Amino acid sequence: MPALTRREFLRSSSAALVYGSAFVGGTRLLASPFDLPIGLQLYSVRKLLPKDYAGTLKQVAALGYQEVEAAGYFNHSVKEVREAIDAAGLRLPSAHYSHDDLSRDFDKIIDFNKELGVSYIICSFPGIKNPARLKGHSFKTIVQSFTIDDWRWNAEEFNKMGEKVKAAGMQFGYHNHTMEFRPQHGIVPFDELLRLTDPSLVTIELDCGWVMVGGGDAVAILKRYPSRISMLHVKDFKKTRKPASVVAPPPAAVLGTGTADYQPIFEAARRANIKHYFVEQEEFDRPPMEALKIDADYMKNFKT
């Protein structure tokens, strides 16, 4: 999800499974470059799900996606979500929640996702150690205001959350944005997070697109932390004359048409511990399902 346009979502959203293959209509479907099912982060269809939850999931499956990652359940019950996922022929291995959501309703979130059969609970956006200091500030200001002390506090939070999620039979993880790669006093927050979090309690979902926008090197990260990263987000951005920044990312693009070079990233990822990957496109210049079909085909046909 984006560092800026997800504000509404962040404020309002309420044993790992490894799928080496998927079967649709008796046909074995594997996706390059990982021989893993093609996944979609459902934030991509956040405007469609509230209107027709079950129907949107069926459309997603018809595009060629086999797994989805939740970004809110839109007030549906466990039974309703499970029925919609099953009716679409999809798998739901992972769910996103902001730190604020997790802090407010952690036990309910654990219980809901455990009953649903989810394997990963992912923190989609970090917290601020002392939120009062930023009360009333814009989201843009908040994104720029994370200190090393905030990141170290988040590491402590993630370890505690990881213990509870692990005790419930699931895996806790963290999904990066852009600000984790802006050095502070010679320290890269992303590296500090991984240094201070317990590998048995906290896995990483590496958003390759946000790494690039934030000034990081996804290839180097995958090579440095091959055992810590179990999931990927795959996105692309349009070419633009304006320089990208932590708080001003370029517009989203369909995969294969923008600035991202996934060949070296996927080559490095093949040597890592990737269990799932999810396409995520957050803005569209064409009908969303048309764009997401192009994204799915890009992944299906990608060769490393």
How should each PLM-predicted stretch be described?
Residues 40, 60, 68, 85, ...:
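Conserved, mostly hydrophobic/aromatic
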Residues 32-33, 57-62, 76-92, 107-118, ...:
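Acidic (Asp/Glu)-rich catalytic clusters
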Residues 48-59, 103-112, 214-221, 262:
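Short, acidic/polar
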Residues 14, 67, 91, 99-204, ...:
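Active-site acidic/histidine proton-transfer and metal-coordination neighborhood
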Residues 166-259, 266:
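Acidic/histidine-rich catalytic cores of soluble enzymes
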Residues 24-51, 58-59:
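C-terminal segment of N-terminal export signals and the immediately downstream linker at the start
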Residues 46-50, 69-80, 98-106, 131, ...:
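Acidic-and-aromatic substrate-binding clefts and catalytic sites of carbohydrate-active enzymes
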Residues 1-18:
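N-terminal secretory signal peptides and thylakoid transit peptides that target proteins
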